Structure formats: C-alpha cells, structure tokens
Amino acid sequence: GIHAALATWPAVQAAIQRGETPIVAVLGAGSMGLCAIAGLRRYVPQVRIIVGARYPHQQAFARSLGADVVVPAAELARAVRRESGGHIVGDYLSGGCHATIDAVGSSDSIMDCLKFTRPRGRVVLLGMPAVVSLDLTGLWHRETALIGAYTYGTESMPDGTKRHTFDLAIETAADCQLNRLVSATYRLDDYQNALAHAAGAGRRGAVKIVFDLRASDARNKKETN
C-alpha cells in the first residue's frame, strides 16, 4: 500500500505545481487499499482522498486512516465527479482525479479507474497480477499513465530523499496502529479455517486474517516434550 501511495506522487506534484488541490481516489478498502490510504495521508498529506469501499466496516477504517470522502464503491464515480467538478463525456469524466489507486484488481475496477481519472492522470494498479480484459481506447485518447505497484522497492519521497519501502511500512504500521486491521489469528495447522475466513473476510466484517506461528511452535514443543 505504501508503494502504491507514493506511485501517485508525479501526478500529485504536477497538480500542486498548477495550483490545484490534488485528488486521489482509492477503489477498494481491503487490507491493501486501507494501507494505501494510510500511506497517502502520512507521506502525501497534500492530497484529498476519496475512497470507494464495499462494506461498512471498511468505510469506517478508511475514515479513521484519513480519507476525506468515503462512499460505497458503486457511488465512487459520482463522488469523484462532485469533488472534482467534472462532467460526464461519453463514459468518462472531463475532469476527475489526478491519480487513482485500484486495490480490487478486476477488469471492471480498472476500467472504472480509467474512466474517472482526468486526462494525463495516473492509475496505479495495486496487488496481485491477473489476466484482465480492458478497453484501452480512453487510455490512449486521454494519455493516462497506467502504473503497476507490486510489493516493495526503494521509494523516491516527495522531499527528494530515498527510503526503503519496508522502513516506511514499519513506521506507518506503528504510527497508524495498523494492528487493528488484524481481525483474526489462526494456528498454522488450522489453515483450512483460516483460508475460509479470509475468502469471506469482507462479508464477515473482517479485514486481515493472519497466522500466529508462535501458537503453532508452542504446540509443537509441547507435543515433542
């Protein structure tokens, strides 16, 4: 999420240089989307953050992490239009966000991001790669930058310094108390229930499901003794 947040900086910087208030939309508020929101608010504080989240608990977390506008995912395009003052031209907004982070990863979500990112804006794809089908006509006509953000690297910070993503993630996790995103822990040998919980995390009111290897190690030692 931190990596994706900082990938918006070129578009944000260009908006600031033009005297505009930079707008960044985040589509999806699972663990990756929420971490992107935290990264934006911490490291790119100039932005106005608009979030589309499917579930009420995701919406609440998004607000607590610093999002300015939070709406159900289906209403994100309308919220972007209202905040940016853009108009619908065909399937696209005439204005829209300066940058958008897609934290869903489906064909529909990527197309939505392309539609409400302004011309010469930037769409950042966050998460695991997959095969998708897209109509890229608007990308060419509007000269949109489509950027992938995967895991980590050496980040170019807005102040010109270089930082490692892991260092930034550790700082953000502590300062934003991201441990509250952990909804349940499981022993490693209880992986079937853990995976089932993770698969239905959103509708079950959960965000992040994790394994507690300490519990598994303690049990193994006890059985060995």
Question: Which residue ranges define each predicted feature?
Answer:
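Mid-domain Rossmann-like dinucleotide-binding core that forms the NAD(H)/NADP(H) cofactor-binding site
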Residues: 1-78
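C-terminal substrate-binding/catalytic core of Rossmann-like NAD(P)-dependent dehydrogenases/reductases
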Residues: 81-86, 90, 94, 133-184, ...
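C-terminal hydrophobic helical "lid"/dimerization subdomain
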Residues: 88, 111, 164-225
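N-terminal Rossmann-like NAD(P) cofactor-binding module of classical short-chain dehydrogenase/reductase
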Residues: 101
